[in-house]
Amino acid sequence: MEIWLLRHAVAEDRSGSGRDADRTLTEDGHKRAREVARGLAALEPGIELILTSPYARARQTAEPAARALKLTAKLRETRALEPERNPDDVLAEILAEKVEAVLLVGHEPHMGTLLGRLVAGRPGLAIPMKKAAVARLTWSGSGAATLRALLPARVLALVGASAE
């Protein structure tokens, strides 16, 4: 199974409601999310399903990716990608989906903890991800995954721009 991790793009510091879940992307964050989506699509990742945190900023990062990958009908929210959740919750969810390639969109420190969990094959390692960065892994469904790439947003933006 191919697992692609995408950390949300730059978000506002505070939401109008004061709730963390309601924080939205900044103008630059929206732009970066679109650039990353184009870069991801240019890589032709074969993604079949996109799971995103229900938080506004993650959803706003996932939506351009879903459009670029022509997967808007395959974009679903899951609480397993909310900040501070146990990475094993989302791993159980993707195993139940029985797909060959999935994109997970979420937050730090959860994404870094999930990435570390996959690379180490067990809890305890965290590999921080920058905003709008993408990691690509191959995982058998148990044990350690193989990290194939860890791409900063600016690299994906260049990939997307060169593909146009």
Residue ranges of model-derived segments:
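A short, gly/pro- and small-residue-rich
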Residues: K70, L114-L125
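Active-site-proximal alpha-helix that buttresses catalytic centers in soluble enzyme cores
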Residues: E2-L81, R85-D88, A96, L125, ...
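Domain-level recognition of soluble alpha/beta enzyme cores
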Residues: R122-T146, P152-L158
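Short active-site-adjacent structural elements
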Residues: R14, G112-L114
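Generic beta-sheet signal
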Residues: I3, V99-G106
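Residue-level signal for well-ordered alpha-helical positions
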Residues: P64-A65, R117-L118, S140
